[in-house]
Amino acid sequence: MKKVISLIIAVLFIATAFVSCSKESAEQTSSTESSKSLSGTVATDGSTSMQAVIGALGEAFEAQNDGITVTYNPTGSGSGITAVGEGSCDIGLSSRSLKDEEKASGLTETVLAYDGIAIIVNPENPVSNLTLDQIASIYKGEIKNWKDVGGSDAEIVLIGREAGSGTRDGFESITNTKDLCAYRQELTSTGDVITTVAGNPNAIGYASLASVKKTVKAVSVDGVSPSESTVKDGSYVVQRPFVLVTKKDTPLSDVAQKFFDYATSGEANEIITSAGVVPAN
């Protein structure tokens, strides 16, 4: 009798284990199939300064998620904010914080990272450091010649960004030069500013630190050189946020939400850092 009871218990144990394993296997299969079936496009639009970091995040995300594509339209911060508000993209990209009226219209911001705004000159320019006050005076047209700040006897050529640019907004806010700058040229992208300054020995401009190339020279501001570490510790004062903009009361699509969650997670920090900016997370 004891043998019969033992046999029954053993059979019941095996049956229970089989059912449990079958259930777990089915759940795993269902989860895998669900992940594989998720496909579509995540449309981002906005800041040209965010090209490097969004490009890096998009590439890494696509490598982990077959069937999902992340697109980027470099239209500038203002246009990206408008695009997400109008529903023509999933996520807007802004290199400035949202204004009160933009928040009031139903938009919300999530800070992705922090980026320095580099003050750039031609590599031939001997000037390597400027104070914040000198930068403001230069852009307001009060200092017109490089010799007045330790450079050559040559007229300063002021290069800036177009109205609506997040980089311009950040630069003018920090230097207190909003609507006061005497620009020679107002260009529509970070790349254009860098190219123009690289081609003119007397030019000065501002650009995302993450985008600065060896064709230009980033000067120190108040004795502090722009770098990831000085942006992170706050000693380099010319900096601004990189922001993801979404609609407050409108849920993202499943694929857009998955990308958003990835970009703002600790998992993405290494990718963000490799793009030359400081993760906010």
Which residues are covered by each model-predicted region?
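Alpha-helical transmembrane segments
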Residues: 11-15
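C-terminal motif of bacterial Sec signal peptides marking the signal peptidase cleavage site
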Residues: 16-20
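Positively charged n-region of N-terminal signal peptides that target proteins for export
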Residues: 1-9
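Exported/periplasmic ABC-transporter solute-binding proteins
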Residues: 4, 21-281
